[in-house]
Amino acid sequence: MSKAIIKLDHIDITFHQKKRTIEAVKGVTVHINQGDIYGIVGYSGAGKSTLVRVINLLQTPTKGKITVDQDVIFENGEKRLSSQELRKKRHEIGMIFQHFNLMAQKTARQNVAFALRHSNLSAAQKESKVTELLELVGLTDRAENYPSQLSGGQKQRVAIARALANDPKILISDEATSALDPKTTKQILALLQDLNKKLGLTVVMITHEMQIVKDICNRVAVMQEGSLIEEGSVLDIFSNPREDLTKDFIKTATGIEEALIKIKQQEIVKNLPANAALVQLKYAGKTTDEPILNNLYKKYQVTANILYGNIEILEKTPVGEMIVILEGAATNIDQALNDLTHSDLTVTVLKRGV
């Protein structure tokens, strides 16, 4: 079992502005295991970026305890490392942002090399290291280009190479893909996944997009107004979200909301007959292998008309969603719904015929 490389325990962050007090983060506990790609999702102002900045003490918490790679760096309102020790610890944590923060007058190679300016490596070793990093992020042929000559995705690759220059154990991505188009976003996410596997890198993804969490993360925390409201594996959160905000986020990543809008406009749904029910089914794991709908007809003479279906793979587990119209005698439909509920499915009756 992987050990926690980041432990944030009971973190409070409070800002005082004139006569106003802002509780940006309230009592948040998050443990991130080594090798995780861990998503922290929330809308603007949720406190996610503020929380993550305490990992390397770019933001000092008001209360709480911070442990990074077994070292307690903050506890009981005090830093536990000397300035020199903290500087060394920060080298273990790379960061990338929405804005690439590249130096316009330096080439891609020079931008990456800048991160090694305090390194003990020789000039030749630094040169070799930069070449290796640019190759790692797929920019060997762009090494001598200036930022103005690079696309957004290429600039972010330079930023990633720079963030990896000091061989960090942790990479924090703070909305790093939000300025990129969908295709480039997928490419950057694929690169981060590759780096996670090749380097054993722990990646912390700050985002407001649940699609990114679904595509790359293995665990996720959901924040709202400074509080952590839900946390777990991506599979568990997508299969069985508890909080309304989490459910709203998941809808943006599955397409179910758009499907429901279109389905409810269909005549067959508008004029649903008395012997029918419009039902939404969510299922995961082994349930996807079972002929559930066929069994309903065999057992209850209830037919199923599939209006929408989608299956995705999360953490090597199939997760699916369907919207169906069940038709049959009212008592038989009730029995069928009860059967579905006891088959490890999440069943929501959207409409009954009248």
From Swiss-Prot:
Keywords, comma-separated and alphabetical: Amino-acid transport, ATP-binding, Cell membrane, Membrane, Nucleotide-binding, Translocase, Transport
Subcellular location: Cell membrane
Catalytic activities: L-methionine(out) + ATP + H2O = L-methionine(in) + ADP + phosphate + H(+); D-methionine(out) + ATP + H2O = D-methionine(in) + ADP + phosphate + H(+)
EC class name: translocase
A Pfam family recorded for this sequence: NIL
Gene3D superfamilies, per the entry: 3.30.70.260, P-loop containing nucleotide triphosphate hydrolases (3.40.50.300)
Database matches in SUPFAM superfamilies: ACT-like, P-loop containing nucleoside triphosphate hydrolases
Source superkingdom: Bacteria
Topology versus the membrane: Peripheral membrane protein
Residue numbers binding ATP: G42, Y43, S44, G45, A46, G47, K48, S49
Quaternary structure and partners: The complex is composed of two ATP-binding proteins (MetN), two transmembrane proteins (MetI) and a solute-binding protein (MetQ).
Name of the protein described by the UniProt record: Methionine import ATP-binding protein MetN
Taxonomic source organism: Streptococcus mutans serotype c (strain ATCC 700610 / UA159)
Primary gene name: metN
